[in-house]
Amino acid sequence: MLFKTLSLAAVAALSLATPALAEDVTVTLTGVEARGGVIVASLQTRGEFMQTSAAHADRVERPAAGSVRLTFRGVAPGDYALMAMHDEDADGRMKMNGYMPAEGWAMINGDALRGPPTFDLVKFTVSATGTDISVPMTYPR
């Protein structure tokens, strides 16, 4: 009887340790301006936040004005930050004007930022069934 109870406990523990299935995250960037170049976007975990690489990335060459839709496949449930930039000259770097971006960018809650972003301010949660979000682009004037 003890062996049977331990076996059931082991099966239960293994089933709880199984990672959640990965799903798709669809991001719609609104307010995109036709400025040439490329829109580069990534989903970043807390550990990847504000780094140059992330496990989930996508890009759109020469985006047209309006909305751009990106799909990130195989994203595990959890908290992520969306980082997007409109790299107008496609040099792979965000141009800055002092401390402000000189190219288009987007983050969750980006319009509410009054200083450098933190993961907790710009994160969103990916559910076990996938997630669809819409985020406005911000362009310098």
Region annotations inferred by a language model:
Residues V25-V32, A41:
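A short, amphipathic beta-strand motif
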Residues S7-A17:
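Bacterial N-terminal signal peptides
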Residues V32, R73-V75, S127:
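Hydrophobic loop/turn residues within beta-sheet-rich immunoglobulin-like superfamily modules
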Residues Y80-A84:
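A short tyrosine-centered beta-strand micro-motif
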Residues E88-M96:
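Acidic, glycine-anchored loop motifs typical of Ca2+
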